[in-house]
Amino acid sequence: MSSLYYANALFSKYPAASSVFAPGAFPEQTSCAFASNPQRPGYGAGPGAPFSASVQGLYSGGGGMAGQSAAGVYEAGYGLEPSSFNMHCAPFEQNLSGVCPGDPAKAAGAKEQRDSDLAAESNFRIYPWMRSSGTERKRGRQTYTRYQTLELEKEFHYNRYLTRRRRIEIAHALCLTERQIKIWFQNRRMKWKKENKTSGPGTTGQDKAEADEEEEEEE
């Protein structure tokens, strides 16, 4: 009871809203009336509003795009020409051959160069002296045993030049080749000549005659 009394006393101190504001102070206008006011440009649905026309085109024909094409909608809404939608990639396709690494002209040039190199290699002539085989190797210095050297020195002491028959006999006896016997005697004669430089010219002539005789026997 006391709470109701205090509530009535509180609200009785403030007057009603209708008594405070005079009637007609605020005109009653709805949002639709505000939007349709012709004095406010840009908000009405006038004939010069392209965006509203495009929106109407979007939702015409049952709320879909069946009644109007996309080109027509954008043309009406944004002022684009119909030729703007007919763009193609012809310039890009024309310049693609120059940009792409697989250029047919370059590929043909590389192929011709390769063919010319192969033809030049095939025509290159290789002579026998230019060929190197793995079996051929530098011959090392021949070493003779003590027995072989002793026997060769004995033979050289008796005869400084050997006939072919005698050279073959010594080669078989010492297990050497004829070429090895011949080389050894040549080196031994050179050594002997250096040791006997003080000898007269008669000795040199005699050695030359013996050498010629040995060459005739070899033939």
UniProtKB/Swiss-Prot annotation:
Protein name stated in the entry: Homeobox protein Hox-B7
UniProt DNA-binding residue ranges: 137-196
Disulfide bonds listed in the record: none
A GO term, aspect molecular function: DNA-binding transcription factor activity, RNA polymerase II-specific
PROSITE patterns: ANTENNAPEDIA (PS00032), HOMEOBOX_1 (PS00027), HOMEOBOX_2 (PS50071)
Chain ranges for the short sequence motif Antp-type hexapeptide as given in the UniProt record: 126-131
InterPro entries attached to this UniProt entry: Antp_homeobox (IPR050296), HD (IPR001356), HD_metazoa (IPR020479), Homeobox_antennapedia (IPR017995), Homeobox_Antennapedia_CS (IPR001827), Homeobox_CS (IPR017970), Homeodomain-like_sf (IPR009057)
Region Disordered, residue ranges: 193-219
Residue ranges with Acidic residues bias: 210-219
Cellular component annotations (GO), alphabetically ordered: cytosol; nuclear body; nucleus
Subunit details: Forms a DNA-binding heterodimer with transcription factor PBX1.
GO terms of biological process kind: anterior/posterior pattern specification; embryonic organ development; embryonic skeletal system morphogenesis; myeloid cell differentiation; positive regulation of branching involved in ureteric bud morphogenesis; positive regulation of transcription by RNA polymerase II; regulation of transcription by RNA polymerase II
Entry's family note: Belongs to the Antp homeobox family.
Keywords: Developmental protein, DNA-binding, Homeobox, Nucleus, Transcription, Transcription regulation
Its biological purpose: Sequence-specific transcription factor which is part of a developmental regulatory system that provides cells with specific positional identities on the anterior-posterior axis.
Species, as recorded: Rattus norvegicus (Rat)
Tissue expression summary: Predominantly spinal cord and kidney.
Keyword Transcription: yes
Subcellular compartments: Nucleus
Matching CDD domains: homeodomain (cd00086)
